[in-house]
Amino acid sequence: MNISATILLAFGMSMDAFAASIGKGATLHKPKFSEALRTGLIFGAIETLTPLIGWSLGMLASQFILEWNHWIAFTLLVFLGGRMVIEGFRNTPDEDDAPQYRHGFWILVTTAIATSLDAMAVGVGLAFLQVNIIATALAIGCATLIMSTIGMMVGRFIGPLLGKRAEILGGIVLIGIGGQILWSHFAG
């Protein structure tokens, strides 16, 4: 996977966390940068670990399904991307409207884990491709740190406008990467 695909994957994977951070920022009363950075660090750390876990699981099975690798990566990315697009169009109840001043650590960890499960599945798919998983996981984690921090700071301003669209955009990026993987297999 080339560097542009890695960057697209990293920011595509960060969109769930970005959307969640917008929601978290929207519920806080004047979030401070330190709170946004704390959220970004938690989300980024977990989002770095989950593709590594998925990749490890995928490597255990790689000897059995190596000839299907492009189809597995394509299917996982299209499935996850499609799920993100569908979730982006769903109407979900808003979080509690009462302003808060800080989110609890375990609430953030739980949210980060929930938004990073797709990164674990992508890690499984990446096990069947020739990628530097450490660099890819770090790129995903850094993109998530950046996007989550930004999402928290601007959440209360753009939450009603962009919140779900961020998830839709992330899903479209994942579907595009899946298509690129399949195309590169058949083209070359």
Swiss-Prot record:
Q: What is this organism's lineage? A: Bacteria, Pseudomonadati, Pseudomonadota, Gammaproteobacteria, Enterobacterales
Q: Which GO terms describe its molecular function?
A: manganese ion transmembrane transporter activity
Cellular component aspect of the GO annotation: plasma membrane
Entry's transmembrane regions = 3-23, 41-61, 62-82, 106-128, 143-163, 168-188
A Pfam family this chain is assigned to: Mntp
Positions of disulphide bridges: none
Family statement drawn from the similarity comment of this UniProt entry: Belongs to the MntP (TC 9.B.29) family.
Per UniProt, the keywords (alphabetical) are: Cell inner membrane, Cell membrane, Ion transport, Manganese, Membrane, Transmembrane, Transmembrane helix, Transport
Q: How does it sit in the membrane?
A: Multi-pass membrane protein
Q: Where in the cell is it found?
A: Cell inner membrane
**The protein, known as:** Putative manganese efflux pump MntP
Answer yes or no on keyword Ion transport. Answer: yes
Question: Where primarily located?
Answer: membrane
Q: Which organism is it from?
A: Enterobacter sp. (strain 638)
Keyword Cell cycle on this protein?
Answer: no
In UniProt terms, what function does this protein have? Probably functions as a manganese efflux pump.
**Which InterPro entries does the record associate with it?**
Mntp/YtaF (IPR003810), Put_MntP (IPR022929)
